[in-house]
Regions:
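N-terminal beta-alpha lobe that positions the nucleotide/phosphoryl donor
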Residues: 1-186
């Protein structure tokens, strides 16, 4: 079990992590931007450290600032919460390189699961049930139409690289599939 963790996030998720850590008797370090200095998560944590200006790209997404904060406060692990750096394999790797545990999936798992086509293939290989769909990348609208005819409508059309729900379209009927495919492919 960790003695101290740094929460690389803000707001409600940071508050929840702090409360859970407190129940486990784990000390917490909150990070904050200059805009969030008096935010609730900074007040609830055992320690709080500024990681940069209000702009998220210069604070909550600044890997070097967050790792420096963890080293300075002697945190043993970093909990990313969700969003920000939570799915950043480079961040997870850098945590490992400086001897700080990343609380979440490994960088390798993030890389595998970040590509939807590869993720689906890995799930099938591991015998995890998956919903009917393509067996790989769909290159043309005609190929998408053939797959949709086989499995039936409605279908969900997903851009393989889209994350967080981006690039996903529900298609109710064949006549809408071509335009949805073109949108997802652009």
């Amino acid at each position: 079990m960790f003695r101290k963790i740094l929460i690389a996030n803000r707001g409600e998720i940071a508050v929840r992590i702090i409360r859970a850590a407190r129940e486990l008797v784990i000390a917490t370090v909150a990070v904050y931007s200059t805009a969030d200095k008096e935010a609730l998560h900074t007040l609830l944590a055992d320690e709080a450290i500024c990681i940069g200006p209000g702009k998220a790209t210069e604070s909550y997404l600044n890997i070097n600032a967050i790792l420096s904060a963890a080293v300075l406060t002697e945190a043993e692990a970093i909990h990313p919460g969700f969003g920000f750096l939570s799915e950043n394999s480079k961040f997870a790797t850098m945590c490992e390189e400086v001897g700080i545990k990343f609380i979440g999936p490994s960088a390798r798992v993030m890389d595998v699961m970040g590509d939807k086509i590869n993720a689906r293939a890995q799930m099938i290989k591991a015998k995890v049930p998956v919903i009917p769909g393509s067996d790989g990348e769909v290159h043309t609208a005609e190929e998408a139409l053939a797959i949709a005819e086989k499995i039936g409508y409605p279908v969900m059309l997903k851009a393989s690289a889209g994350g967080g729900g981006k690039g996903i379209r529900k298609v109710e009927k064949a006549e809408d599939l071509v335009s949805a495919f073109e949108t997802a492919s652009s």
